[in-house]
């Protein structure tokens, strides 16, 4: 991914990982992760989706606090390899058939937090087509970008997972009218 991602299959997050992939020098390598998702698949139609964030790729970084250090567009690629009972294989990749929409996370920075617009929620967005996740005009074709396959490398470093959840201490309205949960 160019940026951070969470990937979902049939409405469930495929791992407990957060801030994936870890930091890398994007001009030298692109990290990928491997997940076992067999238990999340079911007969018939299955739905995969991803939520993207700026991360280290295009978010604020470094002593200069500059943005877009490696690029200015987030991107995500996925390859799902299906192995059937008879041993045959099928590979499903992301590509121009994928669709995108504006997510409720409208701002996401590693060091500056997150802004969430609940009005943009689609409760079942990563599940097979339901009236709730396919409102007319909401989804659009994604823009595909080439990536240098030679730079792909398996993530070897440890992964980031939630260790503790801390409840909000207060909710208030900021001077600009937005609601802040702190």
Language-model segment annotations:
Residues 1-118, 182:
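Accessory beta-strand-rich segments of carbohydrate-active enzymes
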Residues 88-181:
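Activation corresponds to long, low-complexity, non-globular regions
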């Amino acid at each position: 991914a160019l940026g951070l991602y969470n990937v979902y299959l049939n409405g469930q997050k495929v791992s407990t990982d957060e801030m994936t992939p870890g930091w890398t020098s994007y001009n030298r390598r692109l990290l990928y992760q491997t997940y076992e998702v067999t238990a999340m698949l079911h007969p018939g139609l299955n739905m995969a989706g991803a939520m993207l964030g700026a991360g280290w790729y295009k978010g604020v970084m470094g002593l200069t606090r500059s943005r877009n250090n490696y690029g200015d567009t987030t991107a995500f690629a996925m390859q799902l390899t299906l192995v059937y009972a008879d041993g045959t294989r099928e590979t499903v990749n992301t590509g121009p058939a994928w669709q995108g929409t504006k997510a409720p996370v409208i701002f996401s920075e590693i060091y500056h937090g997150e802004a969430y617009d609940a009005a943009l929620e689609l409760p079942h967005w990563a599940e097979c087509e339901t009236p709730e996740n396919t409102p007319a005009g909401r989804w659009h074709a994604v823009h595909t970008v080439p990536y240098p396959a030679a730079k792909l490398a398996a993530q070897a470093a440890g992964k980031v997972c939630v260790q503790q959840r801390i409840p909000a201490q207060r909710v208030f309205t900021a001077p600009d009218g937005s609601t802040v949960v702190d």
